[in-house]
Amino acid sequence: KWSSKSPGNYDYPAPQGREAVISEVEQAQEEEEEEASVEFALSSDIEDDYEPELLLVPEGQPVNQPMLAAAQSLHREATKWSSKGNDIIAAAKRMALLMAEMSRLVRGGSGNKRALIQCAKDIAKASDEVTKLAKEVAKQCTDKRIRTNLLQVCERIPTISTQLKILSTVKATMLGRTNISDEESEQATEMLVHNAQNLMQSVKETVREAEAASIKIRTDAGFTLRWARKTPWYQ
């Protein structure tokens, strides 16, 4: 289950126009730095057995939810493997759940500004972990082609996750506002969704390439990730 501190509410004035949005983005970024860290994460001991409700499409909601679909796609890829002894898989699963939470915050229209910004920060933190571990796997991989492929996909992640934090802050300032046009709000949502899709796809590809690279690591290298396939429930 998700755990967080009470996020509270921003008490913004209601200026008009695009300059107001930019001003609020800057204010939100300043205030978020002062906030204590809040984590949307699962305990690692239940991660493997947890079937998250956040990744299900609620009744009455449209099926076409691209951000949630991207989270589901990454989660399906990550849950092929046990996260025990594999921090890349554990971080990828956290990212999928966090992205599903972000989808809920954005989709519902009732999301809390601070919760959305914090969720983006937590996603960025998990993505940094994936990138760091993937680079270590690449460093130890003896196959040049596989090593190059892994580095190419994982090195995209930091830039995309940084963009996610910025776009989430922009979108957060619009939540609950009545003086933002539908066009501006929709544009901000579309940019955020597109970024989320790119991030989930990059992490998904990183998981696949890291597994391939792990096979090409010398046993005496001193660095290992445990890649244990999970047995499907129907077997």
Swiss-Prot record:
InterPro entries: Alpha-catenin/vinculin-like_sf, Vinculin, Vinculin/catenin
MF terms (GO), sorted A to Z: actin filament binding
Modification note: Phosphorylated on serines, threonines and tyrosines. Acetylated by myristic acid and/or palmitic acid.
GO terms classed as biological process: cell adhesion
Subcellular localization: Cell membrane; Cell junction, Adherens junction; Cell junction, Focal adhesion; Cytoplasm, Cytoskeleton
GO cellular component, one term: podosome
Keywords: Actin-binding, Cell adhesion, Cell junction, Cell membrane, Cell projection, Cytoplasm, Cytoskeleton, Lipoprotein, Membrane, Phosphoprotein, Repeat
Gene3D superfamilies given in the database record: Alpha-catenin/vinculin-like (1.20.120.230)
Family, as annotated: Belongs to the vinculin/alpha-catenin family.
Its biological purpose: Involved in cell adhesion. May be involved in the attachment of the actin-based microfilaments to the plasma membrane.
Name of the protein: Vinculin
Encoding gene (name): vcl
